[in-house]
Amino acid sequence: MGNIWEYNGSALIGIKGXDCVALAADKRLGCSYQTLTIGNEERIFRLSQSCLLGLAGLQTDVLTTYRQIRMKSNLYHLQEDREIRPRATAKMISSFLYKHRFGPYFISPIIAGFEADGKPYLGAMDTIGCLDDCTNFQIAGTASDFLLGLCETHVKPDMSEDEILPLMEQIIRSATNRDAYSGWGAHVVVLRRDGTTSDIPISTRMD
């Protein structure tokens, strides 16, 4: 089967702006080089009015993790009588992954959203929950090598939504063109400070 991290393929990127956060992901599901489905795989989920979750990696673990975190976030809402914020979500996922470190989930999560004080938040972690929330962008998936250079070159602090959208489109399209394990369509989900979202489709190579 080869590298289990590359088995299903994925491309995921998150950018933190001045008044919005955005996640972009491809829509391909495959078994290594064999494409199984196109245009249907969701890797970006909305956990609350102020929090987005992106998951790249083995698709079975992606769906299992999402359902577990969705359940935990709903319980948090019931117990605390308020919606979970992205920093608390990141801590929750980190704890969940570390708990399963001896039989890990093969995923790379990216969490984006807004804290109660209105500040944007962006964090990511490895498969055992080591959290990194110190940068303006995060990347994950088999296309990471192709995403990294473009993000380091073009992503700046406090970018506006009008700057982020065309940049993410350019980055995800360029990366999926070079990675055989990802592509076949993509989309960008933008979350604004007022809780509104936009889901923008991106055309990519379909071969």
From Swiss-Prot:
One matching Pfam family is: Proteasome
Q: What is its main location?
A: cytoplasm
A GO BP entry: proteasome-mediated ubiquitin-dependent protein catabolic process
Sorted alphabetically, which keywords does the UniProt record give? Cytoplasm, Nucleus, Proteasome
For this UniProt entry, which segments traverse the membrane? none
Q: Which Gene3D superfamilies match?
A: Glutamine Phosphoribosylpyrophosphate, subunit 1, domain 1 (3.60.20.10)
List, alphabetically, the GO terms of the cellular component aspect: cytoplasm; nucleus; proteasome core complex, beta-subunit complex
What is its subcellular localisation? Cytoplasm; Nucleus
Q: Which InterPro entries match?
A: Ntn_hydrolases_N, Proteasome_beta_3, Proteasome_bsu_CS, Proteasome_sua/b, Proteasome_suB-type
Q: What does this protein do?
A: Non-catalytic component of the proteasome, a multicatalytic proteinase complex which is characterized by its ability to cleave peptides with Arg, Phe, Tyr, Leu, and Glu adjacent to the leaving group at neutral or slightly basic pH. The proteasome has an ATP-dependent proteolytic activity.
Give the family per the record: Belongs to the peptidase T1B family.
How this chain assembles, per its entry, is:
The 26S proteasome consists of a 20S proteasome core and two 19S regulatory subunits. The 20S proteasome core is composed of 28 subunits that are arranged in four stacked rings, resulting in a barrel-shaped structure. The two end rings are each formed by seven alpha subunits, and the two central rings are each formed by seven beta subunits. The catalytic chamber with the active sites is on the inside of the barrel.
The name of this protein is Proteasome subunit beta type-3
Origin species: Giardia intestinalis (Giardia lamblia)
GN (gene name): PRSBETA3
